Structure formats: structure tokens, C-alpha cells
Amino acid sequence: MNIEATLKNYDLSKLNVVTIASHSSLQILRGAKRHGLGTVAVAKPGSGWFYRRFNFIDNVIEIDLGSMEQLAGDLVKNNAILIPHGSYVEYVGWRRALSMPIPTFGNRYIIEWEADQRKKMRLLEYAGIPIPRSFNDPTQVDRPVIVKLSGAKGGRGYFIAKDAGELAGKLSSINTDDYIIQEYVIGVPAYYHYFDSKVYDRVELFGMDLRYESNVDGRLFNLAEPTFVVTGNIPLVLRESLLPTVQKYGEDFSRAVAELVPPGMIGPYSLESIIKDDLSIVVFEFSGRIVAGTNVYMGVGSPYSVLYFNEPMDMGERIAHEIVNAVKRGKLINVLT
């Protein structure tokens, strides 16, 4: 869409932040309201009642999320800025996200890369970030591996195999070839939250978390195969000596996206990693938008946010801060696609 032409008809004093009512929407909309922006939640039929309980949400619209384009005209008339997150990627789909006729905060084109596991790894490799070994031929597997399906499904459908024989048996039971086989790296998981600011021209390391996954983090007692469906998140603070490496990876990723997926990273994104016992960091995934792990800091702010703003701020507030200050500096077009 022609963002510049659309913004000419916007009343920039009456912007409305719009997002799908799921994932990190409460954090996003609360942050928008705190910064004086209007707020709209687009909910699946039957789920809007929950979001109507919160007075920081001005309007809750229930609609089949696959038909969200039907709302675009009215939303644009009301100066809408769409904030994508994982549920938007999953339920609306990356193809619709690319063509959605609503100005979108962030780089909407990275969503296509995020939806494809092979393109994901290619982008990380291009950035020069250490990644796990991948196997194109299942018969060549010589170590424990994890099989990952494409799409933002919160880890649903992923599984582990200890060797090539076990892998062959498990692959025969799935009905898709849209997956990658990746070395299962042993270590501590850590998920890093970044914000690429066009207002301040910097990449901010804004926080980090651990995922709590069912049932690999539950009580298996050898009664079930481990699965990786995300059920929640846990705050994390890293030892300070690791922070320069994490910052460098975030900046390297931002540079790679600028080269391969113009106009580059805008706003929140995440690198997902394993920290090995030698303290080396291997990155196995990225998310090109806000991640649900940022919810652990909602209302209290990440401890790292004070390093930039001298006050705690959560990612929802950070997004709103960027929008408001982009308007003040005449840079709103620089944070939208």
C-alpha cells in the first residue's frame, strides 16, 4: 500500500493502535493508552467479552480473523496503525499480512521470512550469527535433533529424535514436508527482546525471558513424549559478561535484515537461543515482531529499559513511545510499512 498517500489523510492527533486480541495485545493496548493513543482490539467471535473488561481498550470488534480485510476501510478512516504479533501471523497469515491495507508498525515483509523455517535460518546465517547445524537428508543425522514445523504456532508440533532411526519413524507420522531438521543444542534457553528505533537510530537490548513449554517443562515421569507448546514465560536477567555478545547479535541481525528485507527492522524483534556450558550462544530462531515473552514485564518494565530511558518501560509502552515521538519528529512514515 502507499503509506505516504494514506498518512496524508490521517489526523495524527487522533491515531488509533489496532491489534488482534491475543498474544501480547493487552500489553500493546495498555501501552498505547498510556501514551494518549486510541485503542482497538480485533477479537475472534466469542472472545471479545474478556477484552471489554479493560477500560484502556476503547473498542472491541469481533470478526473472523481470516476476514480482517473487511475492517480495513473503517480502520483507516479512523487513523489506524496496526501492530502485528504472533497471533496475527498465525491467524491472519503472512500472505494477508503482506497485502493488509492498513499502515503497519514494523516491517511487514519480515513476516514472510518468519513463516518459513528455511528462510529464517538463511537470514540468521547471513547475519553471521552462530546457528545449529541443519540436516537436509534425514539419513545423515548422527546426533539428537529437533524437527520444527513452519509458522507461528508457539512450538506446537515440534519433536525430538535421538538418532536417524527414531527420526525416520517419527517423520513417517506427519503429513507435511514443510519442516526443518536441526541439531538439538544442549544448554540453557534464553530469548532476547530487542527494539530497533528509527527515532533514536539504535538497537536497544530491551529484555529477555525463558519459555515455559508443555510438556517438556512439566512432569513427564517418562509417561509422554516431550512437546514444546508454549504455555507461559519467565523473566530472565543474564550475567553481564554475556550482554555484549547478545547486543552484537541483535545489531548484526538488524544489518542483515536491512540488506535482505528492506526497509529493515523496525520496532520489536527477538532472537531465540541456547547458551552452552562454555557460555557460547547459539541462535536457533527469530521473531520479527513483538514476542509474548515481553508480557512478563507488563506494567513494571524490563530492568534493561531503564538503561535507555532512566525509568522502567514495557515493550507495549516502548512501541507507543516510538509512534508518538515519530509523529513529533516527522518520522512516522519511517516506522510504518
From Swiss-Prot:
Q: Which species is the source of this protein?
A: Caldivirga maquilingensis (strain ATCC 700844 / DSM 13496 / JCM 10307 / IC-167)
Q: Which SUPFAM superfamilies match?
A: Glutathione synthetase ATP-binding domain-like (SSF56059), PreATP-grasp domain (SSF52440)
What does this protein need as cofactor? Mg(2+); Mn(2+)
Catalytic reaction(s) noted: 5-amino-1-(5-phospho-beta-D-ribosyl)imidazole-4-carboxamide + formate + ATP = 5-formamido-1-(5-phospho-D-ribosyl)imidazole-4-carboxamide + ADP + phosphate
Q: Where does Mg(2+) bind?
A: E272, E285
Question: Which residues are involved in binding ATP?
Answer: 144-191, 213
For this chain's record, the cofactor binding note is:
Binds 1 Mg(2+) or Mn(2+) ion per subunit.
Classification via PROSITE patterns: ATP_GRASP (PS50975)
| Name of the protein described by the UniProt record | 5-formaminoimidazole-4-carboxamide-1-(beta)-D-ribofuranosyl 5'-monophosphate synthetase
- What keywords would UniProt list here? ATP-binding, Ligase, Magnesium, Manganese, Metal-binding, Nucleotide-binding, Purine biosynthesis
Quote one Gene Ontology molecular function term: magnesium ion binding
Name the pathway it acts in: Purine metabolism; IMP biosynthesis via de novo pathway; 5-formamido-1-(5-phospho-D-ribosyl)imidazole-4-carboxamide from 5-amino-1-(5-phospho-D-ribosyl)imidazole-4-carboxamide (formate route): step 1/1
ATP-grasp domain segment(s): 121-328
